[in-house]
């Protein structure tokens, strides 16, 4: 049966638990999955239903969680759970943060269920409204229901839910489980919660007790069965986190492949939830794309590259590169074995080559830093070339300074640029030049001292070494002298 979407009056996300099985100083709901904290996934799904009110319930390290959510969820209401334990008490605390006259559908979900979708929450709200239910519970049939509350039924429908720790042997055999996600009629929820006690093995206020109370009062309790069990899976420990992360990544990769992206080896590719890829992008094996990375059409990334918050232009090639907070222009080439640090901006058709590190540097259109160089705190104009083994010396131990290189510049290998310094348009430099002063446009910079050859130095200073023996042979050959055949050659 197709149900029409319904806008909930409120969505409550429960995120107050300590998560002791994670064995972590970080609150469980802040552990990342696919580039977002667990609770971030839950809040995005909740926000996707367009509720009138969105509430998150916090307790453990509440200030830390609140701070982490402030940027992406500035309008979410935060309710703090007191020392009374249990999901029922958490929902009571959320209701206290909402208008007293709230009416309509209230959805309740959890901050550690990252794959639950907005579409499923909308289906739940729609089924709840269409059935005129007081409570609608989201359920699933699991081959192994261990750890989940069991859904109890009779011939008339759902009669209640029993937590595993309180279940009888007969009830433990039930495979239909409670997802912990509900739709409630607001008034019925308020009234029933006020009558829930703590007479159970854990001494907690169970939200599940509301179902039997509502049913006893004549309210309609129904279930919406979910076929995709991954959507209801929660995170209690690191093993479950890894399982859910792998499934989330598999779904992300499939979504991009169906959208026209080539992913050569899904088994070695990880793409965060907020990454954007255009059609005809190619992702080679061993690639990780994190944060808000954007890759434009026709670009090739990989193999063996990790990009975080990097923008890659159309037709660019980025191979065996580690980059963060950088921009790679259209048709540009990066790598192999390049390191793009924050603030790197490579222009169209430019090149950052093998064993090159860049930081806070702008490299203009068509300019190249082909190999074995460090470019930090620099601006390089268009169509310039930086020779191999060049170092932009930007730090004097106290302050950092900037180097500016103009257009159509040709700099020699093994140059050092001691900032602050400017190299004018069309300038050249010789190999091994240390540039300490500005170079005028069109000038050749060269400051290498004349070469001196100290003849006979090796024979005089390193006698008996293989180098001395080789030098002696060369000298003998050049003068026509026949070397002694019984001379011992050092190994």
From Swiss-Prot:
In this chain, UDP-N-acetyl-alpha-D-glucosamine is annotated as bound at 14-17, 28, 81, 86-87, 110-112, 149, 163, 178, 236, 341, 359, 374, 385
* Major localization class: cytoplasm
User: What is the E.C. number?
Assistant: 2.7.7.23, 2.3.1.157
The record places the active site at: 371
Q: Where is this region: Disordered?
A: 460-491
Please indicate which superkingdom the organism of origin belongs to.
Bacteria
Which residue stretches belong to region Linker?
A: 239-259
Q: Where in the cell is it found?
A: Cytoplasm
Q: Which reaction does it catalyse?
A: alpha-D-glucosamine 1-phosphate + acetyl-CoA = N-acetyl-alpha-D-glucosamine 1-phosphate + CoA + H(+); N-acetyl-alpha-D-glucosamine 1-phosphate + UTP + H(+) = UDP-N-acetyl-alpha-D-glucosamine + diphosphate
Q: Which cofactor does it need?
A: Mg(2+)
Chain positions recorded as acetyl-CoA binding sites? 388, 394-395, 413, 431
Q: Its pathway? A: Nucleotide-sugar biosynthesis; UDP-N-acetyl-alpha-D-glucosamine biosynthesis; N-acetyl-alpha-D-glucosamine 1-phosphate from alpha-D-glucosamine 6-phosphate (route II): step 2/2; Nucleotide-sugar biosynthesis; UDP-N-acetyl-alpha-D-glucosamine biosynthesis; UDP-N-acetyl-alpha-D-glucosamine from N-acetyl-alpha-D-glucosamine 1-phosphate: step 1/1; Bacterial outer membrane biogenesis; LPS lipid A biosynthesis
Query: Per its UniProt record, what SUPFAM superfamilies does this chain match?
Result: Nucleotide-diphospho-sugar transferases, Trimeric LpxA-like enzymes
Which keywords annotate this record? Acyltransferase, Cell shape, Cell wall biogenesis/degradation, Cytoplasm, Magnesium, Metal-binding, Multifunctional enzyme, Nucleotidyltransferase, Peptidoglycan synthesis, Repeat, Transferase
A Pfam entry, by short name:
NTP_transf_3
- What do the Gene Ontology cellular component annotations say? cytoplasm; membrane
In terms of InterPro entries, this protein maps to:
Bifunctional_GlmU (IPR005882), GlmU-like (IPR050065), GlmU_C_LbH (IPR038009), MobA-like_NTP_Trfase (IPR025877), Nucleotide-diphossugar_trans (IPR029044), Trimer_LpxA-like_sf (IPR011004)
Task: List the molecular function annotations (GO) for this entry.
Answer: glucosamine-1-phosphate N-acetyltransferase activity; magnesium ion binding; UDP-N-acetylglucosamine diphosphorylase activity
- One biological-process term from Gene Ontology? cell wall organization
> Which parts of this chain are annotated as the region N-acetyltransferase?
260-491
Tell me the cofactor note. Answer: Binds 1 Mg(2+) ion per subunit.
Known partners and oligomeric status: Homotrimer.
Record's family?
In the N-terminal section; belongs to the N-acetylglucosamine-1-phosphate uridyltransferase family.
NCBIfam families the UniProt entry points to: glmU, PRK14352.1
Query: What is the name of the protein in this document?
Result: Bifunctional protein GlmU
Q: Which organism is it from?
A: Kineococcus radiotolerans (strain ATCC BAA-149 / DSM 14245 / SRS30216)
Q: What is the lineage of its organism?
A: Bacteria, Bacillati, Actinomycetota, Actinomycetes, Kineosporiales
């Amino acid at each position: 049966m197709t149900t029409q979407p319904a806008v909930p009056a409120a969505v409550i996300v429960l995120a107050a638990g300590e998560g002791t099985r994670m064995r972590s100083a970080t609150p469980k709901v802040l552990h990342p999955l696919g580039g977002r904290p667990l609770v971030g996934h839950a809040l995005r799904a909740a926000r996707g239903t367009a509720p009138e009110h969105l509430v998150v319930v916090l307790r453990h390290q509440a200030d830390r969680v609140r701070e982490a959510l402030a940027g992406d969820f500035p309008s979410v209401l935060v309710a703090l759970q007191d020392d009374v334990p249990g999901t029922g008490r958490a929902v009571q605390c959320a209701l206290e943060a909402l208008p007293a006259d709230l009416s309509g559908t209230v959805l309740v979900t959890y901050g550690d269920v990252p794959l639950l979708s907005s579409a499923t929450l909308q289906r739940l709200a729609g089924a709840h409204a269409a059935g005129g239910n007081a409570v609608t519970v989201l359920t699933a049939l699991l081959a192994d229901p261990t750890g989940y509350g069991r859904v109890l039924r009779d011939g008339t429908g759902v009669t209640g839910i029993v937590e595993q720790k309180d279940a009888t042997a007969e009830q433990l055999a039930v495979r239909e489980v409670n997802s912990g996600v509900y739709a409630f009629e607001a008034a019925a929820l308020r009234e029933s919660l006020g009558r829930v006690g703590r007479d159970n093995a854990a001494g907690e206020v169970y939200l599940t007790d509301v179902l039997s109370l509502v049913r006893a009062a004549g309210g309609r309790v129904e279930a919406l069965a979910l076929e995709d069990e991954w959507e209801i899976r929660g995170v209690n420990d690191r093993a479950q986190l890894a399982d859910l992360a792998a499934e989330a990544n598999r779904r992300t990769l499939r979504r991009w492949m169906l959208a026209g992206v080539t992913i050569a080896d899904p088994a070695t590719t990880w793409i965060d939830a907020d990454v954007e890829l255009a059609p005809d992008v190619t992702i080679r094996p061993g690639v990780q794309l994190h944060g808000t990375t954007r890759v434009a059409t026709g670009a090739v990334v990989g193999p063996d590259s990790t990009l975080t918050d990097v923008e890659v232009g159309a037709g660019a090639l980025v191979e065996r590169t580690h980059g963060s907070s950088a921009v790679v222009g259209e048709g540009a080439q990066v790598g192999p074995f390049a390191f793009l640090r924050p603030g790197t901006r490579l222009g169209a058709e430019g090149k950052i080559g093998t064993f090159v590190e860049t930081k806070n540097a702008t490299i203009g259109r068509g300019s190249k830093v082909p190999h074995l160089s460090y470019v930090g705190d620099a601006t390089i104009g268009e169509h310039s070339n930086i020779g191999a083994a060049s170092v932009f010396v930007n730090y004097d131990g106290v302050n950092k300074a900037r180097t500016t290189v103009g257009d159509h510049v040709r700099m020699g290998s093994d140059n050092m640029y001691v900032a602050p310094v400017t190299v004018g348009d069309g300038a050249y430099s010789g190999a091994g030049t240390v540039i300490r002063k500005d170079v005028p446009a069109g000038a050749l910079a060269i400051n290498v001292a004349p070469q001196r050859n100290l003849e006979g130095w090796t024979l005089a200073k390193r006698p008996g070494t293989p180098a001395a023996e080789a030098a002696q042979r060369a000298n003998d050959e050049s003068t026509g002298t026949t070397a002694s055949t019984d001379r011992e050659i050092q190994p």
